[in-house]
Amino acid sequence: MKHPIVKHFLSNPQHYRLFKNVMESPNEKDARSLDELFKQFYKEIRIVKYMNSMIRIFSIDFDKRVRKNQKRYPLTVDHPEAGDRLSSETGSDAFEEFLDRQDDLSQHVQDYQLYQAIQKLTDKQKSVLTKVYLHGATMQEIADSLGESRQNISNIHKKGLENIRKQLAAQKKGEK
């Protein structure tokens, strides 16, 4: 019984009991009953498989239609007119440009306690955290730009986060 459909059929206790009865003491009635149950089970499996493939094919066709319509009828917001300047020449939006111009992580923090904790970090910790969280740089990219090892940058990053956690915990204890 290596066939997965047969295994699945026999996983039902009722089917297995009937199969066992037919194998131990074969009789025409039980054999026909087992055969009918298996035919019904197999028919259901085929219907489920058909429905599954139809759903998959329909979803692929739907995606194709949506992409075709988007290509055929693009939104006017996606393509600014010649006089409009919604995005820069590099293609980034205005918000990303604003973030790129801001090189201090503390300028992006709205929580005053977090702001104070960031202010107490070393310049190198601030720099690493800014590059990771504002610019999305990897540890390796930061290490290359600062001329240090990836492991050292990772340690600076961890220590910076640890210092922020300690500062916030100390501030919370002071409030209680």
From Swiss-Prot:
* Subunit structure, as described in the record: Interacts with RNA polymerase.
Q: What name goes with this protein?
A: RNA polymerase sigma factor SigO
Keyword vocabulary terms for this entry: DNA-binding, Sigma factor, Transcription, Transcription regulation
Q: Report the sequence similarity comment from the record.
A: Belongs to the sigma-70 factor family.
The record, for InterPro entries, names: RNA_pol_sigma-70_dom (IPR014284), RNA_pol_sigma70_r4 (IPR007630), RNA_pol_sigma_r3/r4-like (IPR013324)
Transcription regulation among the record's keywords?
yes
Known role: Sigma factors are initiation factors that promote the attachment of RNA polymerase to specific initiation sites and are then released. Together with its coactivator RsoA, positively regulates the expression of at least three operons, including oxdC-yvrL, sigO-rsoA and yvrJ. Required for the acid stress-dependent induction of the oxalate decarboxylase oxdC.
Question: Where would you find the membrane-spanning parts of this chain?
Answer: none
UniProt induction comment:
In the mid-exponential phase of growth under acidic conditions. Positively autoregulated, in the presence of RsoA. Down-regulated by YvrL under nonstress conditions.
Q: What ranges are recorded for DNA binding?
A: 139-158
The coding gene here is sigO
Q: Does the keyword Nucleotide-binding apply?
A: no
Q: Name one GO molecular function term.
A: DNA binding
- Where is the motif Polymerase core binding annotated in this sequence? 30-43
Q: What's an example Gene Ontology biological process for this entry?
A: regulation of DNA-templated transcription
